[in-house]
């Protein structure tokens, strides 16, 4: 009698049944969720990761940790995909998804060992998830009414920043709020996160970080002119030089007059071009490639500032910031193609010369956060915190509702779902109860990473909630229950709801797998996927 392995090519692997497939998959997801779980919360531990390119990452950002780990186990990969989906949709809450999915599956493993069938567990999880979606709206503790209110927005951002940069949350929240409000369109729902740029400059401390209304490029201007005010700006994507023919040409020169005339023709051509550009009122020229010395000489003579930006991505962003049209042909631009900037100057930040395009009008197209820090790892980590903060702001533009943070929402959800389990007949009540208990992992982890007794902390929060203080979460400083509205620990409603749905669906998908069939991989290592050409995209 033929077995499955006889039908497949040599080297194929096959796992089936509860022990070999389901529990093995659950174990793989547990291993991955254990890695990120200890990074949860303000006192989350950092991970030191060296990726396939030998680049070092020291971070507690789950999205970065998961992206840089080269996970190959199929079940763990599903968890990675869920985290990536959360990152793409919400920009925050990746660790929440991974930790919660891992805990759901841990609880499911307990039920499987008790003898429950996977389909009964899945039914219970689906019922619990549906019930939670019904009751979650009654658990909203704060609603942001005015997105332009700096004080209120800063309060809502603090929680997201504290989980990445604890101690700097007040300062960074204000910085992010200022940057976001500078580029906020009249219709807040159209807010674009790409309009808030980050420029990292080593040196100084985190508190030296500042916001500039406009665009900052860490490079010096060409030539001697380093500052222009109320400037019309022409942007050329190519170099400023005479065009060269594709064919090689030979010139026969018989006397010295012909030699003088030959070079004079080149000079006249460049002078005419620069004169034509200067006559349009242009004060700043931006070039996308090299600039000849002769062209630079005439540009200086007309007192025009010259900036050379070789990255096409940076060039595109500058055009957006100043409202210019990038030109592909060297010549005098028409007024509609010119950009405008209130101030273009070269400033030394630390020891780095930066070209700043500053706009003084009320609404700017782009605002830039200039991040300072002692090491590149700190700069990268602050950039990730800012990225999360900007994404939370974008979420607030669409939905200003907030749930209690600090584990308060999870404990209240657990209480209500356990009451629902008691009222549910049949075997699914066991899986509903385990689903409810899984939420305790969040306050438990917050207590553990803060150095408090997790069991005591959870029982104290339960006691506070039983007395009717449903907004009480864990105060990580004292380890005692405290109102989240006093601590300003708020979690975005949309992000948390999406994360819970994603975690429930991922856990159910893993539980539905009863066989794993893997063909023999092709020889040789697979090349890593190409990322974006521009590191900032």
Curated annotation (Swiss-Prot):
Subcellular location, record wording:
Cytoplasm
Asked if the keyword Ligase belongs to this entry, the reply reads: no
Superkingdom field = Eukaryota
Q: Where does the UniProt annotation place the signal sequence? A: none
Described purpose of this protein according to its UniProt entry: Molecular chaperone; assists the folding of proteins upon ATP hydrolysis. Known to play a role, in vitro, in the folding of actin and tubulin.
Which family does this protein fall into?
Answer: Belongs to the TCP-1 chaperonin family.
Please report the name of this protein according to its UniProt entry: T-complex protein 1 subunit theta
Q: Which organism is it from?
A: Dictyostelium discoideum
Phylogenetic classification of the source organism: Eukaryota, Amoebozoa, Evosea, Eumycetozoa, Dictyostelia
